[in-house]
Amino acid sequence: EDHCWFGHTQIRPNDPDTILFCHEGPYDLIDARLWLIKSDGSRYRCCRKQPSDLILTHEFWLPDGSKFAYVYRETTGDKIENIRLMDPETLKEEILMPCSPFAHFICDKKNEYMVGDSQGSDVPIHLLTEEMLKEKANTISNDFIYLIDVKKRTEKKLCYHGTSWLA
């Protein structure tokens, strides 16, 4: 009954009664993005709190449904960015590896590889000033697609996609 913007709804593999979804919106205006609920409406629960200087984005289930993955990005302090995994039963969080500033990412059906598209800026679009937009329009940024080897915990650039939310 809350007046929230829900998104990224996903049914858990091997457990179709568990649904992962997010409270969508600018990261600094929501207090928790990651949520779980059972298909009958029970076990509605927040997976983790989200302070206003933390971005959590593009959550997805691992193919076996044992965990879900997401990007974790601090916007202040050390500005840590990494891929994290969470157990949907215990809500225990695990750091998989550091990563580039992905806007989106997903894994293959064996969870051997992931691909991510970088967004070219570590400043979220709703916080870009007019001056920053003009400056970015004339530069080649970190707009790459990356391949991640999950076992080796490494990433490499595959190609430059050159697209942007800005234009």
Walk through the language-model features, giving the residues of each.
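Multi-bladed beta-propeller domains
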Residues: E1-C4, I37-I55, L85-F102, D149-L166
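Loop-centered beta-sheet repeat module
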Residues: D2-C46
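Conserved beta-propeller blade repeats
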Residues: D2-I19, P51-V71, C99-D117, S121, ...
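Short strand-connecting beta-turns/loops that link adjacent beta-strands
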Residues: N14-P16, Y27-D28, S52, D64, ...
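Short, conserved, GDST-rich strand-edge loop motifs in beta-rich repeat architectures
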Residues: F21-D31, R73-G77, G116-I140
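A short loop-to-beta-strand structural motif that recurs across blades of beta-propeller domains
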Residues: R33-W35, N82-R84, F144-Y146
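Extended hydrophobic-aromatic, low-complexity segments
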Residues: N82, E94-I95, F105, P124-L127, ...
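C-terminal closing repeat unit and adjoining cap/tail of repeat-based domains
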Residues: D117-S121, E131-A167
